[in-house]
Amino acid sequence: MPIHLEIVTAERVILSDDVDMISAPTKDGRVGILPRHAPLMTILEPGELDIIKNGERTPFAVSGGFMEVLPHRVTILADTVERADEIDEARAEQARAEAEARRREAQSERDMALAEAKLRKEMVRLRVAQLHKIKRRQS
């Protein structure tokens, strides 16, 4: 019996489908969600969001947000989400370099925090894109 997953951003619905498992990066560490999971509300951290359906793993890069888990339904309200195969690795690398430069030049704690958050987001995007590229080569 699958669990229904909805991934939503402010712009659009990214995914609405029945899946077998969800593995998400939360404030308290990675959480694996299977059908009939206990109710849970948690904060998502930037990281790799994995969706398993019919034995196939689909990785996403998530920049943060919230996840509500009910026994037969999971809703993810994400700041940003990208499928691994949608990430432009060259643009992500350029954005990472720009975030590192902003971090070095930060004059205030606020600027430093913003630059570090952007850097974490771009590092996640790069890691997810690179893992997807390796998986494609192995197939």
UniProtKB/Swiss-Prot annotation:
GO terms for MF: ATP binding; proton-transporting ATP synthase activity, rotational mechanism
GO biological process: proton motive force-driven ATP synthesis
Keywords: ATP synthesis, Cell membrane, CF(1), Hydrogen ion transport, Ion transport, Membrane, Transport
Membrane topology: Peripheral membrane protein
Span list, region Disordered: 89-110
Superkingdom to which the source organism belongs: Bacteria
Localization annotation: Cell membrane
Primary localization: membrane
Keyword Phosphoprotein: no
Family matches, as PANTHER family: ATP SYNTHASE DELTA/EPSILON CHAIN (PTHR13822), ATP SYNTHASE EPSILON CHAIN, CHLOROPLASTIC (PTHR13822:SF10)
HAMAP family named among the record's database cross-references: ATP_synth_epsil_bac
Summary of the function given for this chain in its UniProt record: Produces ATP from ADP in the presence of a proton gradient across the membrane.
Family note: Belongs to the ATPase epsilon chain family.
Protein name: ATP synthase epsilon chain
Lineage of origin: Bacteria, Bacillati, Chloroflexota, Chloroflexia, Chloroflexales
Gene: atpC
